[in-house]
Amino acid sequence: VGHIENNESNIFDFIFIGLGASNSLIVLSLIKNGLLKDKKVLFVESSSKSNNDKTYCFWSSQNDSIIDDLSTIISHQFDKIKINNSNVQSLEGLFYYYIRSIDLYNHTFNKLNEEKIVIERAEVTNIIEDQDFCFVLTSSQSFRTRFIFDSRPPRLYKITEKDIYINQSFFGLHIKCENAVFLKDAFEMMNFNVEQNGATQFFYIIPFSSQEALVELTRFGIEKIDFNYASELVKNYILNEFGNYTIIAEETGCIPMTTFENEPSANKRILNTGTAANLIKPSTGYGFKKMYSFAQKVSEQISKNKYDKFNKSNLINKKRFKFYDTLLLIILLKWPLKGKPDRK
């Protein structure tokens, strides 16, 4: 357990716990709006964030502010889609954007360096509350701060019997094929040309060029996908559909799909961010665009010096969409094979 120090150099206005997508988007918004000019800021992150460990995809129109803000790190965009072996269709004014996590991390690192914001490479062991401050403890030291952005995942053991919880787990290969086999401006999703294995499983293909793509097997189910099993399925699928190929990289992950809503922190100085702020859409696992909107809202409140309800900053979820999400999760939980459309 860390010990509390009263060292002046360890006192901060804001401490960010974690340097994932949500906290990156928040700090980028604060920097863009000049809200950290007179602030002392610290990031506490145990990972080096030097690997491309995730990909972020989102739907948007071209004139949305997210495109202006992140245009330098958007590596691919698509205006056409193919769903479950159907014909290629236009997205009609919408685009599907692709960002590599390493590009977001590096973009954030560059901005933090410009602002001389320090990153403490450590894991947070505890947060101790005081009347006027919070103390963030690591194994070796402590830092005092007025406000915390906490992106640590929620403790899902708080889920009640009323809540639904399934996993969206996936295994993907970034490949280069010998032949030109991919349409460059069309991505493919919900390709159910795969065994369902007691859940809902489908392929998802993001092309990077006519020869290069990410081919991913996604599973919606209580049990997470077995990566050895998935690897064999993906490799066989690629060989049968696209011919000979070489593997450039592997991508794995798991996203919670749940009706459980994490409560705001009881401490008015701590704002939950990311998954802990309920920013992942329960029925799809998409969250990046919502994290961006959340960052803009937080930035706006800080610009107005609204700190009285700092811990309760959130995006209002429409009840109608909450109902749809719940309905789809019930179907995926109770009747997983219904997740796959019937062939006509």
Task: List the predicted regions and their residue ranges.
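N-terminal FAD cofactor-binding segment of flavoenzymes
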Residues: 29-86
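A conserved beta-strand/loop capping segment in the N-terminal third of enzymes
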Residues: 61-122, 127-130
